[in-house]
């Protein structure tokens, strides 16, 4: 492998959702260079940051029924019991919830935590308060998915934040998804909540760093040995 190929192999691809933003930053940078060179360099740095924000690295997802993987990169900010969004139809009792906070420096492509069928997708407009606050799950703009699995339904909620103002979904109701498959993206910082069926025990703790499609949040079949992996 040539040096150039080796370098390219280390650079993660950019998600197409980012192309318009990167192009806009690059155009502004060129204009700033023409006006005042130091401003142009600042614009260039912002363009590079924008490209990094929309990076979409390949992830190696463990493939075994019963595993629940992280749907987002970020820090596990909260593990608690909470009522799931009413629009998902997951019941009116509190469920175990794991919240992952994504800063503006994390990868923001979201991945399905499980293999299953998307039973419900529900978008709800709302506010844009700090996504780290507990009340953000109730007050902020959100896009919720209910995914049916042999172990019960999993709720996945994309929550907009203080900076994030656009939730993007790549999937539709009735679609079958694989664990680790890309299902959406949130622009510029946000949060993902995962709601688990009763009886689930999570394998992570608050403050832990999660990697989308790779970090195992829970295992419904802890007694089943053997894992295979799939890059995607």
Curated annotation (Swiss-Prot):
Transmembrane segments: none annotated. It catalyses: a 1,2-diacyl-sn-glycero-3-phospho-L-serine + H(+) = a 1,2-diacyl-sn-glycero-3-phosphoethanolamine + CO2. It is an enzyme of class 4 (lyase). It is found in: Cell membrane. Its cofactor is pyruvate. Its main location: membrane. Binds 1 pyruvoyl group covalently per subunit. GO terms for cellular component: plasma membrane. Catalyzes the formation of phosphatidylethanolamine (PtdEtn) from phosphatidylserine (PtdSer). HAMAP family: PS_decarb_PSD_A. This is Phosphatidylserine decarboxylase proenzyme. The gene is psd.
């Amino acid at each position: 492998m040539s040096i150039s190929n080796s370098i390219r192999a280390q650079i993660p691809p950019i998600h197409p959702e980012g192309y318009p933003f990167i192009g806009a930053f690059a155009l502004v940078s060129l204009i700033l260079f023409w006006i005042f060179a130091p401003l142009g360099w600042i614009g260039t740095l912002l363009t590079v940051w924008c490209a990094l924000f929309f990076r979409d690295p390949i992830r190696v997802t463990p493939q075994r029924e019963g595993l629940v993987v992280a749907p987002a990169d970020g820090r596990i900010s909260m593990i608690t019991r909470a009522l799931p969004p009413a629009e998902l139809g997951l019941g009116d009792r509190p469920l175990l919830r794991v919240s992952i906070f994504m800063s503006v420096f994390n990868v923001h492509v979201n991945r399905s935590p499980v293999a299953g069928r998307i039973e419900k997708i529900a978008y709800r407009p709302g506010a844009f308060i700090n996504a780290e606050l507990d009340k953000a799950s109730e007050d902020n703009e959100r896009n919720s998915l209910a995914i049916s699995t042999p172990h019960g339904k999993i709720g996945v909620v994309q929550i907009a934040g203080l900076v994030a103002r656009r939730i993007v979904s790549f999937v539709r109701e009735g679609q079958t998804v694989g664990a680790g498959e890309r299902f959406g993206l949130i622009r510029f910082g946000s949060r993902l909540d995962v709601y688990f069926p009763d009886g689930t025990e999570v394998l992570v703790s608050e403050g832990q760093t999660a990697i989308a499609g790779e970090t195992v949040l829970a295992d419904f079949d802890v007694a089943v040995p053997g894992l295979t992996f799939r890059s995607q």
